[in-house]
A protein has these predicted regions:
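Short alpha-helical segments that sit at the start of domains
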Residues: 1-22, 26, 133
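Short acidic, hydrophobic short linear motifs in intrinsically disordered regions
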Residues: 29-39
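Short helix-coil junctions and helix-kink-helix linkers
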Residues: 37-47
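Short, hydrophobic-biased segments on the C-terminal half of alpha helices
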Residues: 53-57
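Glycine-centered, phosphate/nucleic-acid-interacting loop/turn motifs that mediate DNA/RNA or nucleotide
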Residues: 63
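Short beta-strand "wing" residues that participate in macromolecule-binding interfaces
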Residues: 66-67, 117
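Short, cationic-aromatic polyanion-contact patches
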Residues: 70-89
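Amphipathic alpha-helical dimerization/coiled-coil segments
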Residues: 88-132
């Protein structure tokens, strides 16, 4: 099966993913010093400033972020949304690992634990809405 995600999307390394998650979790653009602090305190990543700026340069080349200076500080701004990334990532997993079958993906996700009634009801609503649209 052809996998368009790998052709159209430039995937993220594990380090790039953590950096993007830290950026996406912020409500506004984040300064590089603040990003370094969030990476250290929230994600346990003790990256040097040069390491973070190198990753940001790579992320900018892939179209995920833009960086800019404001006064003496540099800032990172997410260009691609977390929702778009997660949607493409899930579709990639569905196509690559589960033969394009959503039922196989859902089955795998439910295999390690039972759904609560609330979760099952919410999934039913999502499925009903997607069939009717």
């Amino acid at each position: 099966m052809e996998n368009k995600f790998f052709e159209e999307e430039k995937g993220l390394s594990a380090c790039e993913t953590v950096i993007m998650k830290a950026i996406w979790d912020e409500e506004e653009d984040i300064s590089i010093p603040d990003l370094i602090e969030v990476l250290r305190t929230k994600w346990g990543k003790d990256y040097a400033r040069t390491t973070v700026t190198t990753f940001l340069t790579k992320l900018a080349a892939k179209g995920y972020v833009k960086t800019y200076r404001k006064g003496k500080l540099s800032y990172a701004h997410a260009v691609k949304s977390e929702e778009d990334y997660k949607t493409k990532l899930a579709a990639n997993d569905r196509d690559f690992w589960f033969g394009g079958k959503l039922t196989n993906l859902i089955s795998a996700l439910c295999r390690d634990r039972k759904l609560t009634k609330s979760e099952a009801d919410e999934i039913r609503k999502i499925l009903d809405d997607s069939v009717n649209n």
